[in-house]
Amino acid sequence: MLDLSAGQILIDGLDISQLPRHDIRSRINSITQDGVFIQGSVRDNIDPRNVHNVDAICDALEVVQLLELIEEKGSNGLSSDISELHLSQGQKQLFCLARALLNPSQILVLDEATSTVDEHTDEIMQKVIRQNFGSQTIITVAHRLESILDHDTVVVLDGGRIAEIGDPHELLAQGEDTEFGRLWKFLQPESS
């Protein structure tokens, strides 16, 4: 997390600049556009603190539909080197989602997490998020607007400032009278 140059961020009413970074990081999971991996085994990457049993790890990988692939491609199952799997970008994102499932936090940040995946992988990710992260706060940074329609609230930024806040469906119903409606129309492909 970066230090703020202005303003403040409150989580549950607490100014995070007054809290130890370790405490903040332990309560936030993030999945970025590129995902984060270390050299080592599948297990090292999904459970870096080595606190989960094999069944829990396999369950998380099954939920994101990667367990079979890891069993097929990995020479030693969870002990296989992560690099020998040659995961696609979408599979890497699903793996990161399995890691978040295995290590739940109060807040899940998705920073362009679906921007480099195909439509099928995006659908899997959205389904897993809907079914498994309902009790968490989810903050999604996205240009693929379809991925945020299930959210309770969207915040539209313009030039680094909040331009609009609201329910995505209510904002879309107002059409181009809203920033979100205009953005939606602008980003939709032309009809043939």
Where are these regions (language model features)?
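ABC ATPase nucleotide-binding domain helical subdomain, centered on the C-loop/LSGGQ "ABC signature"
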Residues: 10, 18, 25, 43-83, ...
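ABC-fold ATPase nucleotide-binding domain signature/coupling loops
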Residues: 10, 67-95, 106, 117, ...
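C-terminal portion of ABC ATPase nucleotide-binding domains
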Residues: 64, 71-73, 127, 144, ...
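ATP-binding/catalytic-site motifs of ATP-hydrolyzing domains
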Residues: 8-10, 14, 161
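A short, proline-enriched helix->beta-strand linker immediately N-terminal to the Walker B motif
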Residues: 102-106, 135
